[in-house]
């Protein structure tokens, strides 16, 4: 049974997270110490440098030869079931929206956005920071290595899946947009960052409005490439005529351009998303860490100290700055629960009920029992990982839900996990 001192260890792990979030909230809400552009820059640093280094460190120090096969299989099955179920719902919702017409389609956000959000909330827990001290008090030191194995699978597979879906949505938007006309007949390279995007737009309350695509590089080139490849696949003569008008200096009205824009080919959209994924540091960090782990634990050597200390300096900023960024995000909203209480309650149900229940059934299917089964279910009831908010804010997709899930989830997770611990022990 978990003791009072072990509960205090969990509180010790929680307190620094809220300290960073409170500091970020107060710095923006009351002290006005950071502008919207600077807040976007902080989050961009975390996504571009701190998190990839943390990923590399976690993956490279995990002994892949001693991973628990049944736990990994149950974790993979849980996430696969959730993702496939959400994708099936998204396809059904998309077909229903098509039948309802363009107005109904415009009134509802993309189902794929909700797939990413619900999947992240349900299946990507804060395993290391919250899970290790909590499960250590419940099940002993054996839980620490098991938690690390789940984190490694998240970083190597599931976060890359999430990023691919983000990039897929961005590629579809870019491909569906008409190619920009140029008086010289050539596309322009216009790199943009979250800092520039935040500086370029503001809402009626003076808050920064997030751009649809924070990491776009040479988007105009990609749009033109997509249009050209679609034309090669057999686009109607209207597109060719429109291209001739642009090259001769005639610019059609925006409505006509949008109406005549060809539907992007699925294979080209996927190819553009894959190319973007291969340019992201997280992809390199996870697979380089995996390669290092395979070699190092096979040959029995360790990381040079100078490299290890350099990585330590960067990776220690990841969690603190992630929580700080979450606090600055909430401070820039008009209310403390940005997504609203109904959506917040819905996300808590997904996090603390749907995720653990699916994990329970997945574990039983794999044949797990005893302490291993209990650890698998309880870790699924841990709060949302801070990294999920970082990517949601970076790609500007339901960051309000993610920030609420992180902040409220840490408060709720302790009593919820204790309830699961008691129920599983009956």
Swiss-Prot record:
Residues in the Cytoplasmic compartment per record: 28-38, 92-114, 167-286, 332-347, 393-405
InterPro entries, per database record: Auxin_eff_plant, Auxin_Efflux_Carrier, Mem_transp_PIN-like
Cellular compartment(s): Membrane
This protein's record includes keyword Transport: yes
Pfam families per record: Mem_trans
Stretches assigned to the Extracellular side: 1-6, 60-70, 136-145, 308-310, 369-371
Topology with respect to the bilayer: Multi-pass membrane protein
Transmembrane segments: 7-27, 39-59, 71-91, 115-135, 146-166, 287-307, 311-331, 348-368, 372-392, 406-426
Tissue specificity as recorded in UniProt: Expressed in roots, leaves and shoot apex. Expressed in roots, stem bases, stems, leaves and young panicles.
GO molecular function per UniProt: auxin efflux transmembrane transporter activity; identical protein binding; protein homodimerization activity
GO cellular component assignments: cell periphery; endoplasmic reticulum; plasma membrane
Residues binding (indol-3-yl)acetate, per UniProt: 51, 126, 128, 159, 386
Ranges where the record places region Disordered: 232-258
Family per record: Belongs to the auxin efflux carrier (TC 2.A.69.1) family.
Protein name stated in the entry: Probable auxin efflux carrier component 9
Organism: Oryza sativa subsp. japonica (Rice)
